[in-house]
Each structure stands twice: as structure tokens, then as C-alpha cells.
Amino acid sequence: EIGGAIENPLSNPNGYKFYQANPSPSTGGNNVDARHVACWVQGMYDPNTGNRLLMIPPEEIASVRLGNQNAGSQAERITYEFDVQDDLVLLMKYAVVLENPGHGDAYDPYFGLEILQEDGTPIDSEASCGEAFFSPSKDPEKWNHYTPSLGVRFVWKDWTTIGIDLRKYKGQKVKIQLTTQDCTLGKHGGYAYFTLDCISATISSEGCDTVSLEAPSGFKYYWYNDENKDFKPTTNQSIDVLAGDTTTYYCKVTYLDKTDCNFVLSSAVIPQFPKAKFNALFKANNLAFLFFYINILI
């Protein structure tokens, strides 16, 4: 989805910015003009950050790049809408790369992220937990800087993780909307990478003696338990408990850059039951398909 008109919250709140429409949003990952690109090669770094920003964050198998480094007063948008059917927490990771012309918020390249309710209003609007807006002139001390050549300056934001508790939106539609745009004067561009995932609001684990309960990476943590008086609260990402422990542990997960934004995960320790372990071998034999199951000795 590419703009004719896309509103920029960092510019005049009473007006809109206008951009040249382009009917070709994607032209392939090897083309500098590509606007919607799937990145799946591990260990690749973005050259416009001095090869310091991973194009795929740790623990992920792929990412999507929205936008390109070309200028021309253009804009791109990706919108994803889905039905919340389970007790889920939405996890999004994003990184931003923008040229820095120093024009000011109203004219600079821009990246926006919004997570919206079914009626279009922002989720967690009071704390702004489901939105993020960036331009080079906004909070300049929070950017990383790279100047590859005379007259070209880039700012970039390393991978950041946000999480939204969707349990109260169960049965509703949720919309995720990301926007990138060039500077309005036509000479500078920008783009962003992102990944998207959902996890259960209950952390479950199984084992024989002790089990590890681990919260998602990219946050601050506070584990606590109201039932087990011997348990000492901790700020580690994970805790180890006995396999027979049936009490419920809770982890308060807080954004790194927005301390008012958090969600709480609960735990469930599941007893370990014996399971068969085998490899499957598939062969095509004339018109027949043969499957072989080979037991693995433990």
C-alpha cells in the first residue's frame, strides 16, 4: 500500500503530507528500488549502518524490509489484520534506518508503527505502548549515527522489541500498520525492518527433575510468586523450578525504552511423560509412496 497521502504525526497535526504514488511496491530483494523485501540470509548486516545492524535479529529466521534507500518523496505501508482467537501476546521487533538531512520533523524521512483496535483506535493509547514514531530530528541522542561519505548521513535504531497483551481483545480484529516515507523535499529516504510473532500468555515447560521457565528476549523482567514463600523474586529472563512444582509463577515483562509499558505472563509446569522418538524416511517406488519409521535408541 503506497501513499498518495499519508499523515505524519510528527508534522502539523492539522494537515497531511502528500507523496508521489507509485504502482510498483516490490521489485525484488536485489533491486535498490524494492519496497517490500523478505530477508532470510542469516548474518547479513545493513551497509548504511557501517555494517553494525543485523538485517535479521537474533533468534529469528527472517525479517521484512519496508521501504528503500531511494528518495523522491515516496512512501510505503504494510497493514496486517488478524482475528484474536486465543490468549496471546503479540511480539514485534523492528529496526529503523533513515537518512538525516536535518530538515526538522515536518520534512525529514519518517517511520511509524501503530497497533490498532478493530475501530481504528490505538491499543494501550494512554501509555502509547502500541505505537512508535521516528524521524532523525526526534530525540537525536537516541540514534546511532553513520556517515559513509561526504554529504550523506544516516541514523539508525537497533532492534527493539515490543509486546502487546491481546487477551482483552479476544474475539476482535487487531490491525498492525507500519509506514515509511522519504523526506518531503525529495532528496532523502529511509526504511525499516520488522518481524512479527504471537506467543501464548502462559509459559509452559516440561522436564523430569527441574524445568526452565523463560520469558521472551528483548525486555526487562521481574519474576514473582505469591504461593511459594521460599521463592525469591528475580530479574533474570528465566528461572528454574522443580518439575513437580504446581504453583503458578508470574513474570512482569517491561519494555526497555518505555517503563510504563508491560505485560504479565504466567507459568505452567507440565510433568514429563515418555514419548516415542524416531526418524521418518520417505521413498517413491514406481506409483507407491513408502514410509519407513526408524526407532532411535536413547
Predicted region positions:
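Aromatic (Trp/Tyr/Phe) and Gly/Pro-enriched flexible surface segments
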Residues: E1-S200
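Proline- and Ser/Thr-rich low-complexity, intrinsically disordered segments
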Residues: L196-I298
